[in-house]
């Protein structure tokens, strides 16, 4: 503590608050030579006052009391301020802890402003898988949740282009689905001794476009079309196969080509597992197979929209042998030791790797130990079925494949007679969504029975 402060606090009785140290130094000579006090009033002279000492301590005591009261007030204010700050700090910490507890650890907060979006899974965890019963129900259709980057595409003629992918637009209605079912019911009635199944496959537009874009493009709901068709099929004669949900579950995988209107071998595999589950059959596992690839596929949509990404065609070689007899459009028969044209090259025809493309009649015979002896299936299909039918060799001893457009050009027997002659036990009407709503192809299917 300084000398001045020592003076202030240790000699309070004689300290005059009206003077600072400079006044004190200036007036010191005057004090020495005269009788005036620091304040200009007469100094106290004990002799002149008759020996009576004035009450000089009373003002000093009042000052001490005032000063003590001020100190007490200041201390109270300091303590209360500290308590208030401490309470606010505790409240802030509690709020932060509660906020962190409510926030999911898997979600990252972003400051980026994005436009509203619908049906996107980019920021949400995938839902739990539905039960097998729900997956196969023909009245239950799980909406696909493809990843949405919130960009727009453009409509080019009959296709929509988005992210360098081509999407074939669907113009069928709910009523046209019912018309397809009526045709299948009539044909099934002509083959009463076999088990009849029907599968309608949605295309890339339904599975690959976010709902935000499906609502903008000139394309109708394929789920509604398929649902109405299946509901109209005769329950006593036709068993529908709901492959829609199996594809929806895998919509963010490479199940459709980018430059072609067909699906990939992987997409066809998921539909095959829906077929196997519906019939209660064991399904082939791709992990038991050997994958082969053909890069550089430029599909049917490339000419309609230049700039689409090229594709890679994948197919899986089975852990068992398959022989395949093909009857071409001239009626000539060819025999192969694989359901795949493994010499197929890159380019616009790479999809032809599956059963050598579209031929009037193809018969595959399997050595799979899961194939039930005597079980034979006939599949009426268009080109969407080419990638699908090889998987059936895992469960069937023989797989007979008829192209609905050309089968009767090489067969003297109609379809019903062919089934009876060849011991067919199961029949599958297989169509992509576009074919199921195409009148010419429906007429071609009906002509198989004439």
PLM features: what roles do these ranges have?
Residues 2-28, 32-450:
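Extracellular glycan-modifying ectodomains
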């Amino acid at each position: 503590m300084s000398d001045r402060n020592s003076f202030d606090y240790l000699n309070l009785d004689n300290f005059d608050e009206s003077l600072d140290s400079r006044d004190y130094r200036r007036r010191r000579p005057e004090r020495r030579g005269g009788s005036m006090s620091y304040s200009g009033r007469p100094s106290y002279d004990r002799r002149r006052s008759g020996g009576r000492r004035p009450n000089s301590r009373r003002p000093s005591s009042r000052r001490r009391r005032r000063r003590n009261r001020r100190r007490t007030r200041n201390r109270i204010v300091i303590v209360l301020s500290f308590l208030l700050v401490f309470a606010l700090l505790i409240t802030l910490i509690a709020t932060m802890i509660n906020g962190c507890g409510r926030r999911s650890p898997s979600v990252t907060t972003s400051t980026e402003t994005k436009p509203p979006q619908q049906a996107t899974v980019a920021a949400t965890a995938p839902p739990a898988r539905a039960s097998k019963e729900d997956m196969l129900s023909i009245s239950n259709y799980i909406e696909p949740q493809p990843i949405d980057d919130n960009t727009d595409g453009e409509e080019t003629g009959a296709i929509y282009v988005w992210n360098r992918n081509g999407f074939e637009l669907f113009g069928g209605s709910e009523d046209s689905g019912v018309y397809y079912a009526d045709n299948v019911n009539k044909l099934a009635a002509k083959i009463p001794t076999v088990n009849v199944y029907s599968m309608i496959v949605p295309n890339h537009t339904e599975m690959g476009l976010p709902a935000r874009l499906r609502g903008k493009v000139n394309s109708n709901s394929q789920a509604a079309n398929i649902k109405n068709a299946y509901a109209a099929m005769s329950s006593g004669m036709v068993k529908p196969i709901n492959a829609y949900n199996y594809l929806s579950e895998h919509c963010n995988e490479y199940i459709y080509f980018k430059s072609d209107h067909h699906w990939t071998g992987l997409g066809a595999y998921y539909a095959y597992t829906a077929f196997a589950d519906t019939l209660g059959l064991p399904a082939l596992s791709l992990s038991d197979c050997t994958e082969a690839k053909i890069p550089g596929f430029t599909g049917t949509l490339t000419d309609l929209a230049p700039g689409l990404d090229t594709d890679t065609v994948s197919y899986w070689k089975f852990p068992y042998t398959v022989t395949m007899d093909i009857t071409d459009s001239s009626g000539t028969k060819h025999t192969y030791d694989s359901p795949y044209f493994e010499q197929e090259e890159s380019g616009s025809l790479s999809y032809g790797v599956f059963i050598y493309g579209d031929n009037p009649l193809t018969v595959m015979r399997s050595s799979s130990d899961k194939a039930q002896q005597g079980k034979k299936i006939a599949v009426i299909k268009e080109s969407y079925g080419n990638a699908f039918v090889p998987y059936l060799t895992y469960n069937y001893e023989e797989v007979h494949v008829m192209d609905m457009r050309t089968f009767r050009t090489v067969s003297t027997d109609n379809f019903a007679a062919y089934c009876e002659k060849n011991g067919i036990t199961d029949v599958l009407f297989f169509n992509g969504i576009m074919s199921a709503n195409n009148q010419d192809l429906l007429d071609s299917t009906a002509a198989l029975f004439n």
